From Swiss-Prot:
<keyword id="KW-0436">Ligase</keyword>
<comment type="function">
    <text>Catalyzes the attachment of serine to tRNA(Ser). Is also able to aminoacylate tRNA(Sec) with serine, to form the misacylated tRNA L-seryl-tRNA(Sec), which will be further converted into selenocysteinyl-tRNA(Sec).</text>
</comment>
<dbReference type="InterPro" id="IPR010978">
    <property type="entry name" value="tRNA-bd_arm"/>
</dbReference>
<dbReference type="GO" id="GO:0004828">
    <property type="term" value="F:serine-tRNA ligase activity"/>
</dbReference>
<dbReference type="InterPro" id="IPR042103">
    <property type="entry name" value="SerRS_1_N_sf"/>
</dbReference>
<keyword id="KW-0963">Cytoplasm</keyword>
<dbReference type="GO" id="GO:0005524">
    <property type="term" value="F:ATP binding"/>
</dbReference>
<feature type="binding site">
    <location>
        <begin position="252"/>
        <end position="254"/>
    </location>
    <ligand>
        <name>ATP</name>
    </ligand>
</feature>
<dbReference type="GO" id="GO:0005737">
    <property type="term" value="C:cytoplasm"/>
</dbReference>
<feature type="binding site">
    <location>
        <position position="275"/>
    </location>
    <ligand>
        <name>L-serine</name>
    </ligand>
</feature>
<feature type="binding site">
    <location>
        <begin position="221"/>
        <end position="223"/>
    </location>
    <ligand>
        <name>L-serine</name>
    </ligand>
</feature>
<comment type="pathway">
    <text>Aminoacyl-tRNA biosynthesis; selenocysteinyl-tRNA(Sec) biosynthesis; L-seryl-tRNA(Sec) from L-serine and tRNA(Sec): step 1/1.</text>
</comment>
<protein>
    <recommendedName>
        <fullName>Serine--tRNA ligase</fullName>
        <ecNumber>6.1.1.11</ecNumber>
    </recommendedName>
</protein>
<keyword id="KW-0030">Aminoacyl-tRNA synthetase</keyword>
<dbReference type="InterPro" id="IPR045864">
    <property type="entry name" value="aa-tRNA-synth_II/BPL/LPL"/>
</dbReference>
<dbReference type="InterPro" id="IPR006195">
    <property type="entry name" value="aa-tRNA-synth_II"/>
</dbReference>
<dbReference type="InterPro" id="IPR033729">
    <property type="entry name" value="SerRS_core"/>
</dbReference>
């Protein structure tokens, strides 16, 4: 959420930021509601002051005028409450301001590749896509996944399930033991206010799964619960930075992706992900972003899979982000660069929505923290890259060395 005072004092800057994102936001309506709110507040203050004076007088005229004032105050309080509710809703629909270092671009086609790491493998045969390899090895079962849950669901079997478990364990171990993140295992169902704080609600409700009876929401990413771990808290400067890592399943309706990537396990309603999350001081957040990217890249380096880093343009960064990078692994069977991580600095956008603050000293005024999030990494796209990059001419899959202690085998046949 943006500071209302900032919008009031910098309306053209905010309008330009929204335009650079190639989206829309109700800036004019916010300014009108803000003006109405300020006028109503002033009018209420005047009436309350007048009523206070009348309360000290005992004559019939003053008593009658006091009754009239009570009615007027009640009416204005109701109007102010409605204006406040509308204003809050509209503010929640305004995206974050892109950092000046973010390139302006109209869509993802203009994202900037910063560098490539690792060499693409030279195959002596035509590499197969993961769905062919998975079915032939009996480690992925699409038909039974559809039988159980419908399209965009699948089942991992035997060594396939073990490979995913090995990847998750390896990632969590690396991030907790080497990168010093604290592991969290959060609930998969969270309250509405958690998703408001993370920025998923109200704007993206259509892409979320919801239990309407009890108003629980299935997590679209561990970012949502991690944003709320310190909601409505005031931290000390000594506690920052805080680094969390969490593995969860993630649930998304993918309504915007209807008809896309229908084969394989690239785009699903349920998938698994290891998420990195940071709380830090404002002056440290961009350095923390670079560290987060390096932490995520180390997974790809360890797996020895070619990848590239992209800086996202203004129109492609997420709703709450001020600056984002994507890590994409190369998958030869589908001949695609697959996004396996998006690392973002959300500055104080989520901190303000979640009301997470810190004090630099015990007497200092509380400030909003900056928050960052990133995949470290996202499955099953990492699975796709492992299966396709490590396939052999006979259809078997060699297990990357770093995963062998978790798998107990060197090859899936």
């Amino acid at each position: 959420m943006l500071d209302l005072k900032f919008i009031r004092e910098n309306p053209e800057l905010v309008r330009k930021a929204v335009a650079d994102r190639n989206t829309d936001a109700p800036i004019d309506e916010i300014l009108e509601l803000d003006n109405s709110r300020r006028n109503l507040t002033q009018e209420l203050d005047n009436l309350r002051a007048k009523r206070k004076i009348m309360a000290k007088q005992r004559d019939e005229t003053a008593i009658e005028e006091g009754r009239v004032l009570r009615g007027q105050i009640s009416t204005l309080e109701s109007e102010l409450s409605q204006v406040d509710e509308k204003l809050t809703d509209r503010l929640l629909r305004v995206p974050n301001i892109p950092d000046p270092s973010v390139p302006v671009g109209k869509d993802e086609s203009e994202n900037v590749v910063l560098y490539y790491r690792g060499e693409k493998r030279n195959f002596s045969f035509t590499p197969k896509p993961h769905w062919e390899l998975g079915e032939a090895l009996d480690i992925i079962d699409f038909d039974r996944g559809i039988k159980l849950s419908g399209s965009r669901f699948y089942i991992l079997k035997g060594a396939g399930a073990r490979l995913q478990r090995a990847l998750i364990a390896f990632m969590l171990d690396l991030h907790t033991r080497k990168h010093d993140y604290t592991e969290i295992y959060p609930p998969y169902m969270i309250k509405r206010e958690c998703l408001v704080a993370s920025g998923n609600l109200p704007k993206f409700a259509d892409n979320l799964y919801h239990d309407a009876e009890e108003d629980y929401w299935w997590v679209p990413t561990a970012e949502a619960p991690l944003t709320n771990l310190h909601r409505d808290e005031i931290l000390s400067a000594e506690q920052l930075p805080i680094h969390y890592v969490a593995y969860t399943a993630c649930f998304r309706r993918e309504k915007m992706s209807a008809g896309k990537d229908v084969r394989g396990i690239k785009r699903l309603h349920q998938f698994d992900k290891v998420e990195l999350y940071k709380y830090c001081k404002p002056e440290d957040s961009f350095a923390e972003l670079e560290k987060m990217v390096a932490d995520a890249e180390e997974i790809a380096d360890a797996l020895k899979i070619p990848y590239r880093l992209k800086q996202l343009v203004t129109a492609d960064i997420s709703f709450g982000s001020a600056k984002s990078y994507d890590i994409e692994m190369y998958s030869p069977g589908v001949d695609e660069w697959l996004e396996v991580s998006s690392c973002s600095n959300c500055t104080d956008f989520q901190g303000r929505r979640a009301n997470v603050r810190f004090r630099r000293t015990s007497e200092a005024k509380p400030e909003f923290v900056h928050t960052l999030n990133g995949s470290g990494l996202a499955l099953p796209r990492v699975m796709i890259s492992v299966i396709e990059n490590y396939q052999q001419p006979d259809g078997s899959i060699v297990i990357p060395e770093v995963l062998r202690p978790f798998m107990g085998v060197d090859v899936i046949r």
